[in-house]
Amino acid sequence: NMIMSGFALFAVDGYDSMLALGVQGFSFRSISEPASELMQRGSREGFIEALMVNLSLIRRRIKSTDLKFELMQLGKVSKTSICLCYLESKVSKEILGKVKKNLEKINLETILESGYIIPYLESQGDFSLFSSVGMTERPDTLCGKISEGRIAILVDGTPNALIVPYFFVEYFQHLDDYSMHSYFATFTRWLKYMAFFLSTLLPGLYVGISTFNPEILPGPILSKIALAVGTTPFSLMFETIIIHLIYEIMREAGLRIPRPLGHAVSIVGALVIGETAVSAGLIGAPTLM
């Protein structure tokens, strides 16, 4: 398995073990900044699909003997190399043991991407809309998490590194927050929290208040909503569901079609389809907003 993975084995007469030297010569793309995690400051480097190159990016940032790499192979057919990275003095031994135990349970034939092993790392039996396993393509972000005692899992063939454990509030954090004044970083983070709760609760509040407690709304707003509802054939609930479905369809189309066309699809979906639906009287303008 080591030879098939590109290692050279160094044997010495009289010893019952050999040294495995990483001399892989596989072709891989150059290091570049990940498009999904842009930053104003900091490094412009991102992980690539070569595991050994990714490990070197981590080692260059954490020059400590406390940093440990544990290599293993998963996948009966693919024999994919996977590496656990952690600081021995800071990592939780209990969590580390659970992660290793869960990885040993994986019985897949092929592992082509780090997403294959995420279901095995999440808490079993606890239903949550938010994953307890984080993901990043930035070496500096990953090294910051490792320095906090987290466990990083890198999979050969993908630039997406996994972080265990990962908490809900970390979805609102960004490495740029640590490069600015604490006042601005705090304001930006609270702005993210507010935007999250508005985007998740506002549609339901709009439908609930407009349908069951319209007296709460000011008179001018209530009159505009009543005028919009009177010109559409659907209820507010059905309008909201339709708009959410259209948004998900346009988002999926923008992700899957070629990149030059993705921006055009977003513009067409937001402007043309929305304006046409309102003009035709299928949905109301307040609901679309």
Language model features with spans:
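Generic detector of multi-pass transmembrane helix bundles and their immediately adjacent loops
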Residues: F196-S199, L205-G208, N213-M289
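Cytosolic regulatory modules rich in charged/polar residues
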Residues: N1-E239
